[in-house]
Amino acid sequence: WQTVVDMGWPAAAIAEEYGGLGLGYLELCVLAEEFGAALIPVPFVSSVLQATEAIKLANDEQQSAEWLPGLASGVTIATLAFAEGLAGRSWSDRPLARGGNGRLHGCKTPVADGLAADVAVVSAVSAEDGEGFGWWLVPLEQAGVTRQAEDAVDRVRKHATLQFDGAEAIRLGRPGAGREMAARLMDIAAVLT
């Protein structure tokens, strides 16, 4: 990971004002292609292509200023936690995890790079979301978060189950916009991977 960070790759598509290189999706796509070709076992997909993009999509100046510099420098590793380990569920289904009052409850599995990540972007439902759902930023080094390694078909990236029991959580983006953000993230992932 340090070699990847030294080359500036986590900063590729982050704006210069947040410590990034200010490049676009074309450059990010080239990097993603090289990672895929070499099967490099680092959290590039989960941290750079998924979680960082989710934070950027939320378009919140304060959250961008707080999280993007650490992600650009590679000091902070993030992951996207939306799967709930239930057969037949889609990324666009309402999550079972519950958020509200700055706390999160529920379970996400499998979570790529869930053991290496410092923070997770988690899909969850709260009273404010109406019929939709939202996204939450959850620092993973805290009481209320339990991580357990999981066996997965993907042998390149380690997967985990993340259990949230009243974990401190910060809303990412506007309430009820989870499905819209998820659809955009899936579009981005389809292009970049």
Where are these regions (language model features)?
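Buried hydrophobic positions in well-ordered alpha/beta secondary-structure cores of metabolic enzymes
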Residues: G8, A15, L31, D60, ...
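A short, Trp-centered hydrophobic/proline-enriched beta-strand micro-motif
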Residues: G74-G85
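A short core secondary-structure module
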Residues: A81, C107-T146
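Cytochrome P450 C-terminal beta-domain/meander region
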Residues: S90-H105
